[in-house]
Amino acid sequence: MPQLDFTWWIINFFIIWTAILLTLVILVNNKTAQNLTTTDSLQIEKNSTNWQWL
């Protein structure tokens, strides 16, 4: 059944390329989000707490 094999080849082709494109989009969005969080984290004031044992 060559038509069925060709149909599965097309389906697998689109599934693989969709997965690759989604992965690239997620990676690109994560890099921009990390750049935003690194600039925001520089403005955070760090305070320490002195613990007192009873």
From Swiss-Prot:
Gene name?
MT-ATP8
Matching Pfam families = ATP-synt_8 (PF00895)
What name has this protein been given in UniProt? Answer: ATP synthase protein 8
A Gene Ontology biological process noted in the UniProt record is:
proton motive force-driven ATP synthesis
What keywords are assigned to this protein? ATP synthesis, CF(0), Hydrogen ion transport, Ion transport, Membrane, Mitochondrion, Transmembrane, Transmembrane helix, Transport
Q: What topology in the membrane does the UniProt record assign?
A: Single-pass membrane protein
Which cell locations does it reside in? Mitochondrion membrane
List the transmembrane segments.
8-28
The protein's predominant localisation is mitochondrion
Instruction: Give the family from UniProt.
Output: Belongs to the ATPase protein 8 family.
Quaternary state and interactors: F-type ATPases have 2 components, CF(1) - the catalytic core - and CF(0) - the membrane proton channel.
Q: What does this protein do?
A: Mitochondrial membrane ATP synthase (F(1)F(0) ATP synthase or Complex V) produces ATP from ADP in the presence of a proton gradient across the membrane which is generated by electron transport complexes of the respiratory chain. F-type ATPases consist of two structural domains, F(1) - containing the extramembraneous catalytic core and F(0) - containing the membrane proton channel, linked together by a central stalk and a peripheral stalk. During catalysis, ATP synthesis in the catalytic domain of F(1) is coupled via a rotary mechanism of the central stalk subunits to proton translocation.
Q: Which Gene Ontology CC terms are recorded? A: mitochondrial membrane; proton-transporting ATP synthase complex
Molecular function, one GO term: proton transmembrane transporter activity
